[in-house]
């Protein structure tokens, strides 16, 4: 399992009430126990991270992903955003507006050259039940020296651009927190890049930003 240190920047989307949408057409959620979950045979562990001292598996949910063909899309262009927004408003749409990204269930609606496409990932620690996250096209990096930011931008030119910064590294025990927009195509690529950055000696931690639709049965 690739280790990505988990910080304090997981974004939770409270999307209550969306689970009844027929787009998702999946069985009603049952009380989860790992011992009796038949879908575990379909799971393929890819990556993970630490939450404090606890290791957390991040697993592509192959069973639902292959059966329903659901992908989460972050459009990169304004025209694409308008197109997906228009599709999501159609009565028989297979595109669901999730507020910042789109859940797409029909392949012809997500095969483009520009979108960032995330698989849905199973996360193994939330309340003992299966919960899901999608990977955002953003990587958050914590460093103690602000010069590291420039080294990262130079090494990953074309893949990362600086979006925002915070922190007070000049204070005793201080740090800098940088948010980089990630110009890649897939969640797997973003996770691998975050893992690579985390392995640097001059980086305290790095992770992809995530959305956790914990109130949506997907």
Segments the model singles out, each with a brief description of its role:
Residues 1-4, 19:
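Positively charged n-region of N-terminal signal peptides that target proteins for export
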Residues 5-10:
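Sec-dependent signal peptide hydrophobic core
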Residues 14-17:
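C-terminal motif of bacterial Sec signal peptides marking the signal peptidase cleavage site
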Residues 23-218:
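Primarily auto-inhibitory N-terminal propeptides
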């Amino acid at each position: 399992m690739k280790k990505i240190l988990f910080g304090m920047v997981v974004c939770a989307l409270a999307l209550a009430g969306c689970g009844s949408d027929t787009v998702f057409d999946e069985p009603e959620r049952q009380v989860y126990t790992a011992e009796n979950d038949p879908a575990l045979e379909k799971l393929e562990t890819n990556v993970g991270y630490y939450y404090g001292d606890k290791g957390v598996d991040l697993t592509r949910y192959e069973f639902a992903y292959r059966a329903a063909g659901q992908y989460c899309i972050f459009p990169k262009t304004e025209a694409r955003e308008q197109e997906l927004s228009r599709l999501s408003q159609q009565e028989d749409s297979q595109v669901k507006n999730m507020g910042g990204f789109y859940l797409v269930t029909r392949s012809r609606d997500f095969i483009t050259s520009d979108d960032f496409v995330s698989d849905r990932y199973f996360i193994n620690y939330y309340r003992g039940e299966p919960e899901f996250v999608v990977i955002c096209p953003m990587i958050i990096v914590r460093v103690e020296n602000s010069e590291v930011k420039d080294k990262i931008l130079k090494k990953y030119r074309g893949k990362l651009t600086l979006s925002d910064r915070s922190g007070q590294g000049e204070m005793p025990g201080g740090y800098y927190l940088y948010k980089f927009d990630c110009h890649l195509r897939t969640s797997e690529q973003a996770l691998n890049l975050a893992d690579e950055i985390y392995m640097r000696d001059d980086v305290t931690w790095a992770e992809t930003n995530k959305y956790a639709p914990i109130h949506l049965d997907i």
